Swiss-Prot record:
It is found in: Nucleus. The lineage of its organism: Eukaryota, Metazoa, Ecdysozoa, Nematoda, Chromadorea. It comes from the Eukaryota. GO terms for biological process: positive regulation of transcription by RNA polymerase II. PROSITE patterns: ZINC_FINGER_C2H2_1, ZINC_FINGER_C2H2_2. Residues 14-27 have a biased composition (Acidic residues). Residues 1-40 are annotated as: Disordered. Gene3D superfamilies: Classic Zinc Finger (3.30.160.60). InterPro entries: GLI_C2H2-zinc-finger, Znf_C2H2_sf, Znf_C2H2_type. A zinc finger (C2H2-type) spans 51-74, 78-102, 107-125. SMART domains: ZnF_C2H2 (SM00355). Keywords: DNA-binding, Metal-binding, Nucleus, Repeat, Zinc, Zinc-finger. This is Zinc finger transcription factor family protein 30. Pfam families: zf-C2H2.
Length: 397
C-alpha cells in the first residue's frame, strides 16, 4: 500500500506550476532537474503503467500524459484556493498569486487544477482524496490516481478535507512549559482549539512526521510568551460533527488558508525564541521573496518621476538663462534704435536746412541776372560772396 501511495502522489502528479520545482528526493531518486513529465519518465521507469481518465475513460502510459490530456481536453481553467477564483492559464495564476496574495510559490493538484500555497496542504488534499477511494480501488490493477473520486471537490467548503486530519492532532498541556524543554525536531503540532472534536483516523504519514509541516507564510517573532498563550486560547474556530465531514464556520470572511497560516505563525515563533534569544528584539521581517510587487512598481514610478522633475528643473534653469540673455540683447537693441532715431532726426534737420539754402541761392541768382550787372566785376564778386555764404550749412567754429 505504501508503494501504491508513492505512485499516486508521485512528483509527476504534484508538479508545481509557474515556478521552478524544489529539490525533492522520493524513493532515493533526485527529480530536481526534471521539467514536466518527460524527465521523470526517463529517470523513474517504475512509474510507467496504466493511467485511466475518469471522465472519458482513455488509458495513458504515463501520468504526465494523463495530466496533459485532462488540461487540454476537459479542464480549461485553474482554481486559486485562497480566494476561490477561476483563472484561465498558469501564467495568469502565478501573477495572481504573487500580486493578490504575495505567494511566490504554488503547488498544483493534477487532478482538479487547484493551486495550493503550501506543499503540505497539497499532500493532505491528495491523501484525503485517496483515502476516500481506497476501498473502491483495492482490486483494480490500474493505478488509482486516474480514477480518484472527484466528489471531494464538489463540497461547498473544500478546505474541510485539509482541516479534518489536523483536528485530531495532540495538544500540549502548556505551550509555555513544553516548548523550551523539547528539541526543535520533536515539537508536536498543536491542534485547532474547538469545543467539540470529531474522531477521524489520523493518516500514518502525518503521524510519523519528524517536524512541523513547513509553510510559506512569513514567520513573525512573538513579543512575549503570554501573548502566544492568549492567541492560542482565543476560540477563533468553531466545529461541529457531521456524518460526512466537519463543517467549519469562521468569525471573519477571511479564507481558510489565511486561518491555517496564522496558526502556523504561532507554531514558528517559539522555534525562533529557542534557537536565538537575541532575535526577539528584532522587528518582524518578510523574506525578500515575498516583497510586495506593488511596492516595486510604486518605487520605480517614483524614481521615474524624480528623474523627470530633475530634467524639468534643468530645462527651467536653461530657459531662465536664455531669457536673461534675450533681455540683455533687447536692451542693446533699444539703445541702438534710440541712437538711430536721433541720427535720423539730425539728418532730417540738415536736409531741411540744405533745401532752404538752395532756394535762397536760386533767388539770388535770378535777381542778379535780372539787374543786368553781370558785366560789372565788382558786382560779380559781391554776388559770388553772397552765394558762398548762403551755401554754408553750418557756421565754422
Amino acid at each position: 500500500m505504501k508503494l501504491e501511495d508513492d505512485k499516486i502522489h508521485s512528483p509527476t502528479n504534484t508538479e508545481e506550476e509557474g515556478y521552478g520545482s524544489d529539490v525533492e528526493v522520493e524513493n532515493g531518486t533526485d527529480i530536481s532537474g526534471s521539467k514536466g513529465g518527460s524527465g521523470v519518465e526517463l529517470k523513474r521507469p517504475d512509474l510507467k503503467g496504466s493511467f485511466r481518465c475518469s471522465i472519458c475513460s482513455k488509458v495513458f502510459c504515463h501520468s504526465s500524459s494523463l495530466s496533459r490530456h485532462r488540461m487540454q481536453a476537459h479542464f480549461k481553467s485553474y482554481k486559486c484556493t485562497v480566494c476561490r477564483k477561476d483563472i484561465s492559464s498558469s501564467e495568469s495564476l502565478r501573477t495572481h498569486m504573487f500580486k493578490q496574495h504575495h505567494i511566490s510559490r504554488m503547488y498544483m493538484c493534477r487532478c482538479c487544477n487547484w493551486a495550493f500555497p503550501d506543499k503540505s496542504l497539497l499532500h493532505i488534499h491528495l491523501q484525503t482524496a485517496t483515502n476516500n477511494n481506497d476501498s473502491n480501488n483495492n482490486n483494480n490493477s490500474v493505478i488509482p490516481h486516474g480514477v480518484i473520486n472527484r466528489s471531494c471537490h464538489l463540497i461547498t467548503d473544500p478546505f474541510q478535507l485539509i482541516r479534518t486530519p489536523l483536528l485530531n492532532l495532540p495538544t500540549p498541556q502548556s505551550l509555555e512549559s513544553s516548548v523550551p524543554s523539547l528539541p526543535i525536531a520533536s515539537i508536536p503540532i498543536p491542534a485547532l482549539q474547538s469545543p467539540i472534536r470529531s474522531q477521524p483516523q489520523t493518516p500514518s504519514w502525518l503521524a510519523n512526521l519528524p517536524k512541523p509541516i513547513p509553510t510559506t507564510a512569513p514567520i513573525f517573532v512573538a513579543d512575549s510568551k503570554e501573548k502566544i498563550k492568549d492567541e492560542v486560547e482565543k476560540p477563533d474556530v468553531y466545529t461541529s460533527q457531521s456524518p460526512t465531514c466537519s463543517s467549519v464556520s469562521f468569525k471573519s470572511d477571511l479564507s481558510a488558508f489565511h486561518q491555517l497560516c496564522s496558526d502556523r505563525a504561532l507554531i514558528s515563533s517559539p522555534l525562533i525564541d529557542t534557537a536565538s534569544p537575541s532575535s526577539s528584539s528584532s522587528s518582524s521581517r518578510i523574506s525578500p521573496r515575498h516583497e510586495c510587487f506593488d511596492c516595486h512598481v510604486s518605487r520605480t514610478k517614483i524614481l521615474i518621476s524624480e528623474n523627470k522633475c530633475k530634467l524639468l528643473e534643468h530645462k527651467i534653469g536653461t530657459m531662465q538663462q536664455e531669457s536673461l540673455e534675450a533681455n540683455a540683447q533687447m536692451n542693446g537693441l533699444e539703445q541702438t534704435v534710440l541712437r538711430l532715431r536721433m541720427e535720423a532726426h539730425a539728418l532730417r534737420e540738415h536736409n531741411e536746412l540744405f533745401q532752404r539754402k538752395l532756394l535762397e541761392c536760386q533767388n539770388l541768382a535770378v535777381k542778379f541776372l535780372q539787374n543786368d550787372k553781370a558785366h560789372d566785376a565788382s558786382e560779380m564778386n559781391s554776388f559770388l560772396r553772397i552765394l558762398i555764404n548762403n551755401t554754408i550749412l553750418t557756421r565754422p567754429f
